[in-house]
Design a protein with these regions (language model features):
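Conserved small/polar residues in nucleotide/adenosyl-binding loops
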Residues: 167-173
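DNA-recognition alpha helix
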Residues: 130-143
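Short, amphipathic alpha-helical "recognition" segments used to contact nucleic acids or chromatin
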Residues: 109-129
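Long, low-complexity interaction regions most often at the N-terminus
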Residues: 1-96
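Short, compositionally biased segments
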Residues: 36, 163-166
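Basic, short loop/linker segments at the boundary and entry of helix-turn-helix/winged-helix-like folds
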Residues: 98-113
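Major-groove recognition helix of helix-turn-helix-like DNA-binding domains
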Residues: 147-162
């Protein structure tokens, strides 16, 4: 098992560890939580399924380790690199550069926001729960308290909702 550790926004790292808790490496579960500040160990590796988009980003963006770059990995999230039957060997292609890490971070943020927006809309229209309370529940469930401002997520949701409702009003002629 070859792993790669990258640095992403702290709230996205927490989201991933809760979202993919069932995909954590079994022998690593006894280690301290990656969200604890006392932990100086490498975060627990997440083993993603081949059906997740992030798995394919990891596969496509992994490159051979550059000779002038340290082998010491730092970051707040660790992934097990894909090991397909054919294609890139993770023993060789085991490095994710800074730009690639930003690309992966953006994809994680897209996944998180899609889940958040679906959660907010479903709670509002099926369960009658107000957006603010739903946002609090989402942030609490994914252990993101203190790492993200709920107001910024709510503003982004409202901008998205305004854009979506505007595009539905203007039909092509």
């Amino acid at each position: 098992m070859v792993t790669v550790t990258i640095t992403i926004k702290p709230y996205l790292a927490r989201y991933m560890y809760v979202r993919y808790a069932q995909s954590l490496e079994p022998e690593s579960e006894s280690r301290p939580s990656p969200s604890s500040s006392a932990s100086l160990r490498k975060p627990i590796p997440i083993h993603l399924s081949h059906i997740t988009p992030i798995y394919h980003f990891l596969y496509q963006l992994s490159v051979p380790h550059p000779s002038k770059v340290s082998w010491k990995e730092t970051g707040n999230i660790t992934f097990v690199l894909p090991n397909p039957a054919y294609g890139k060997n993770p023993e060789v292609y085991n490095y994710i550069g800074q730009e690639s890490a930003l690309t992966i971070e953006k994809e994680i943020e897209v996944e998180m926001r899609a889940e958040l927006y679906e959660f907010l809309l479903e709670n509002k229209f099926k369960n009658g729960i107000m957006f603010k309370r739903s946002m609090e529940l989402f942030v609490e469930h994914y252990n993101m308290e203190g790492t993200v401002e709920e107001d910024s997520l709510m503003r982004a949701f409202k901008r998205w909702r305004k854009t979506v409702s505007y595009t539905h009003l203007t039909l092509p002629t």
